[in-house]
């Protein structure tokens, strides 16, 4: 009889991965990022342990968007809890002003809604241009 091996935090090797978003489709980038952050591409994947990699996304503002007007119609809502305080932001506005936030919101929707998911999203580094301060980590 075979048993499933459960990985321990000491056995997990977390690497740094660089993704260039220029010319790629937004949804496919986010799917790849969520898979890497979660660690589902590794043979030692364990759902209750953070075994994902650190992900650096560059050229975030140069990604392609497909779909029938999704970028123009999609809205993100924020609500503080007070009456009448629902704020909505269109996807186009978010892409122009703060593409980093757009990527974080989309990726967060694909990760677990737990403390582990919050820990995973902290390992995502997004930059609108090609420059980033993580060249030392990526060189390893």
From Swiss-Prot:
It holds the Pfam family Ribosomal_L13. GO terms for biological process: negative regulation of translation; translation. Gene3D superfamilies: Ribosomal protein L13. GO terms for cellular component: cytosolic large ribosomal subunit. Keywords: Ribonucleoprotein, Ribosomal protein. One of its GO terms (molecular function) is mRNA binding. It comes from the Bacteria. PANTHER family: LARGE RIBOSOMAL SUBUNIT PROTEIN UL13M, RIBOSOMAL PROTEIN L13. This protein is one of the early assembly proteins of the 50S ribosomal subunit, although it is not seen to bind rRNA by itself. It is important during the early stages of 50S assembly. Part of the 50S ribosomal subunit. Belongs to the universal ribosomal protein uL13 family. This is Large ribosomal subunit protein uL13. It comes from Sulfurimonas denitrificans (strain ATCC 33889 / DSM 1251) (Thiomicrospira denitrificans (strain ATCC 33889 / DSM 1251)).
